[in-house]
Amino acid sequence: MAPRPPTATPQESVTFKDVAVNFTQEEWRHVGPAQRSLYRDVMLENYSHLVSLGYQVSKPEVIFKLEQGEEPWISERELQRPFCPDWKTRPDIKSWSSQQGVSEVSHSANVWSHATFGDIWGVNTQRHQESWRRHLGPEASSQKKITALEKIAEQNKFGEDSGLSTDLVPQLDVSSSIRPSECKTFGNNLEYNSELVTQSGIPAKKKPYKCDKCRKSFIHRSSLNKHEKIHKDDAYSNGTDQGVPSGRKHHECTDCGKTFLWRTQLTEHQRIHTGEKPFECNVCGKAFRHSSSLGQHENAHTGEKPYQCSLCGKAFQRSSSLVQHQRIHTGEKPYRCNLCGRSFRHSTSLTQHEVTHSGEKPFQCKECGKAFSRCSSLVQHERTHTGEKPFECSICGRAFGQSPSLYKHMRIHKRSKPYQSNNFSIAFEPNIPLTQGESVLTDVKSYHCIDCGKDFSHITDFTEHQRIHAGENSYDSEQALRQQSLSHPREKPYQCNVCGKAFKRSTSFIEHHRIHTGEKPYECNECGEAFSRLSSLTQHERTHTGEKPYECIDCGKAFSQSSSLIQHERTHTGEKPYECNECGRAFRKKTNLHDHQRIHTGEKPYACKECGKNFSRSSALTKHHRIHSRNKL
């Protein structure tokens, strides 16, 4: 068949689905490690060659997963074919599975070099064959034994050899002796043959290509190359230099020098430099660099969540989100800090943690040049320049730049007397305990997690939740933490055997116990002063650096401690959360309340060592000491 002229186009555009084979999660579990590696290499190679031939092939989800190292299975809904629950019990499948194994790499590679994953696992290969026949037209002949991708190369405008891998492409002359297997559940005919090599009409060939490592032989050089990768990967995992693939990443970015294994990866990477986003959402117009990102974004409009956790039933729009979620159940923390050994569930958590070692602050404000270690901190800071206040009080309409500031402001309404507004009034019944009255407003969830979008009413709950993303929770998994909190609702199960004080969390108990033992494991590198808490060391170090990261959004005054900022903000809001049970007087600081309560109790814990006089406040004792100092002069 003569090659088509350059202006000619195929009768029907080729899509990656014509050469791709997909798996469900159940099917993928039964594919061996060596076979998975072969599947990955061939799928990526075929996709790369289709793109290089000029076919407009958008990157499918399975290719994105393979490049990211994720499991490439797709949901049954995406596959749009019935899943056969009893496919594992079919005699032909069991016969094939019993003959396969990681140790028999040669046999499996040989079988797969002539067959498709669909032939072996029961995927409907008839659909692939029909689509190829459409591309080849009436000239297709079973006697020619030309594979589909070889025909694509023939249709190429210059007719040169495309180098496309035919390992995953169905042979057109499927032997009539292959008998379809019937699923007992659905009754569908699924083509399968456990002796595909000998029964498919493919003549027996010599195996001239031999592996130097294990002496296994192969018909095609490409099959030998794929087989040798198994030895390379094994050696690489054992830490030997011989296993490091040399020269495999030969596609280099001219802008930053980064290299890639596939040209398609380089093309996508270069979009970072060019800013190109060719994939646009038809609903909202948002554009993306990758087609897979567009597909995931479109799920946000449809609300579809095809990836479901088999343990708790929670569903996700992305497979990567499901993988991260499952680490909560398994307790897996694959991202480990090389400096301190701490492990994290998410790579982003590790990146944020590593900043604490390096002191790097990559996020810089374009207005004033101030730098931050986190992007979220920069966003909050930029609001001081723009004046943006997105968090608005639903009662009085006052707006704030940060959600914690709104929550602190809401306490004014919670603890105040009946509040009048132009639209409505709100009041707490005097005979109802304050905690019940507060419940009207505790539904306001002012603390928003930027990692997962979850909202919280209380900062303690929000802080505890963030530890899940950072990998800092003291429990092995979120499930264990939830069980612990359910078994001790409002209880304090951790009790000090020295003073009897009880705590809700083991971390608080450990920190408290250091008061009795005198242990101070956290030492300042500047002056050598030691502390029992890491937070105390962090606050102390700011006395050396002069850092004041906590800034008031109302007046711009900065503080080295968050507690100091909270107390300062009460001068703007007028909030006095600490109320005396005896007389009803309220205070901004808890220490002021304690000093005031001694008026009612008559307690005077501060005694003068000179004359023995007692005082209820430390400030009063300090003033009294001046009398003795003047007398000595």
UniProtKB/Swiss-Prot annotation:
Zinc finger (C2H2-type): 209-231, 251-273, 279-301, 307-329, 335-357, 363-385, 391-413, 447-469, 494-516, 522-544, 550-572, 578-600, 606-628
Molecular function via GO: DNA binding; DNA-binding transcription factor activity, RNA polymerase II-specific; DNA-binding transcription repressor activity, RNA polymerase II-specific; RNA polymerase II transcription regulatory region sequence-specific DNA binding; zinc ion binding
CC terms in the record's Gene Ontology section: nucleus
Glycyl lysine isopeptide (Lys-Gly) (interchain with G-Cter in SUMO2) cross-link site: 445
Keywords: DNA-binding, Isopeptide bond, Metal-binding, Nucleus, Repeat, Repressor, Transcription, Transcription regulation, Ubl conjugation, Zinc, Zinc-finger
PROSITE patterns: KRAB, ZINC_FINGER_C2H2_1, ZINC_FINGER_C2H2_2
Name of the protein in its database record: Zinc finger protein 90
Subunit relationships: Interacts (via N- and C-termini) with REST (via zinc-finger DNA-binding domain); the interaction inhibits REST repressor activity.
One of the protein's GO biological processes: regulation of transcription by RNA polymerase II
Primary gene name: Zfp90
Domain KRAB stretches: 14-85
Compartments it resides in: Nucleus
Function: Inhibits the transcriptional repressor activity of REST by inhibiting its binding to DNA, thereby derepressing transcription of REST target genes.
Iron found in the keyword field: no
Membership in a protein family: Belongs to the krueppel C2H2-type zinc-finger protein family.
